[in-house]
């Protein structure tokens, strides 16, 4: 039996790395509750802080909106109404898996108005719907839906582990129209160069502008997971060898303190990541939104001069404190670009 003071953090030394269930009793007698304990190995990660170009391909074709169009008879046509909705993923047409939206639009155009059986994934449920394409004023068969099959952008790599696994962004990639987390079939990281910085001001977030050349030789890694905690995958050995820096211990939530910390970020074309001073203003260990567990404020005059604070594209910049990697930058306050949020690194690692 271990006596516990609820006013102080508790650390338990375990002999093995595994899951445990602990019985909690009041006064050592009255059963109070059971607590699941996950014992993790002391992990070390290399803080990256480098900008990366991101390209992801969706699992199927994402429906971002349903609409009507004018038909040959000048009446409004809505073939997909009540059948498809924003957020649906079209996986197959007549049993044939889709490779991309070009293939899908070609199949619809070639349907000659015959029924198509679409295999749909909606909220994790897979089912079939039957829809009949109709002609627009130019005689082309349409379904009246807006679709997307990929997303691109610029972000920051957070860390690299000993097996060349990386984590980046600190939050998931959501569709700009539906706001839903995008289902990823595959994805890639590319080299990128920061060519411009738009400073943030109150009411208007700033932005890092990067140039991405999607040539094969510029591909530096594969993205396998897009989750609320960030994007994750494997970096090429060549690129991993270029990531400079010492592997640091992972700082768990209970080790993070309010006060001074640093973020590692790259703001210059062909420049190396630099450390910038911040202050941790508040900690939310059990925040409903795990991407907002750490509340930060930029205090480094160099960073304030360059960016005005936190800007888009800095998401994923690792947060360091007391020689440990403790989190990653995720969001900026719209009304105060010097302030923002971060995710605890242990939450990123739980993906």
Predicted regions and their residues:
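Signal peptide-directed extracytoplasmic domains
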Residues: 43-77, 121, 128-134
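Envelope-exposed proteins and targeting segments
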Residues: 20-22, 33, 50-52, 57-61, ...
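PDZ-domain C-terminal substructure recognizer with occasional recognition of PDZ-binding tails
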Residues: 25-42, 105-144
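Serine endopeptidase catalytic core focused on the charge-relay Asp
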Residues: 134-308, 312, 321-322, 330, ...
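Beta-strand-enriched, solvent-exposed domains that form extended recognition/catalytic surfaces
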Residues: 1-31, 37
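Conserved PDZ fold ligand-binding element
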Residues: 79-102, 319-322, 326-331
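A short glycine-leucine-enriched loop at secondary-structure breakpoints
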Residues: 75-89, 110, 308-313
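PDZ domains, with a preference for the canonical peptide-binding region formed by the helix
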Residues: 4-17, 92-125, 336-338, 343-347
């Amino acid at each position: 039996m271990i006596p516990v003071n609820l006013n102080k953090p508790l650390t338990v030394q375990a002999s093995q790395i595994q899951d445990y269930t602990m019985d909690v009793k009041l006064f050592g007698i009255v059963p109070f509750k059971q607590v699941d304990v996950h014992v993790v190995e002391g992990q070390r990660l290399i803080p990256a802080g480098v900008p990366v170009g991101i390209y992801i391909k969706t699992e199927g074709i994402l429906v971002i909106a349903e609409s009507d169009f004018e038909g040959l008879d000048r009446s409004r046509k809505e073939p997909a109404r009540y059948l498809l909705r924003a957020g649906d993923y079209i996986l197959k047409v007549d049993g044939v898996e889709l490779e991309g939206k070009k293939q899908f639009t070609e199949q619809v155009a070639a349907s000659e108005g015959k029924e198509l059986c679409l295999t749909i994934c909606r909220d994790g449920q897979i089912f079939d719907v039957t829809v009949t394409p109709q002609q627009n004023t130019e005689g082309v068969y349409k379904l009246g839906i807006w679709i997307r099959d990929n997303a691109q952008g610029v972000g920051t790599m957070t860390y690299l582990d000993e097996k060349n696994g990386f984590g980046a962004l600190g939050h998931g990639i959501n569709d700009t129209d539906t706001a839903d987390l995008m289902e990823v079939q595959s994805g890639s990281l590319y080299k990128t160069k920061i060519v411009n910085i738009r400073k943030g001001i109150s009411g208007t977030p700033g932005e890092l502008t990067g140039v991405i050349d999607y040539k094969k030789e510029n591909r530096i890694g594969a993205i396998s997971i897009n989750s609320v905690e960030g994007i994750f995958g494997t970096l090429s050995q060549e690129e991993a060898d270029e990531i400079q820096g010492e592997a640091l211990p992972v700082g768990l939530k209970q080790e993070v303190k309010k006060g001074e910390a640093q973020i590692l970020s790259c703001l210059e074309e062909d420049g190396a990541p630099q450390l910038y001073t911040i202050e941790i203003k508040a900690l939310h260990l059990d925040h409903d939104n795990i991407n907002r567990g750490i509340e930060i404020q930029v205090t480094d005059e160099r960073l304030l001069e360059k960016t005005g604070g936190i800007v888009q594209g800095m998401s994923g910049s690792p947060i360091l404190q007391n020689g440990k990697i403790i989190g990653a930058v995720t969001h900026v306050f719209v009304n105060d670009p010097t302030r923002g949020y971060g995710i605890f690194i242990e939450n990123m690692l739980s993906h």
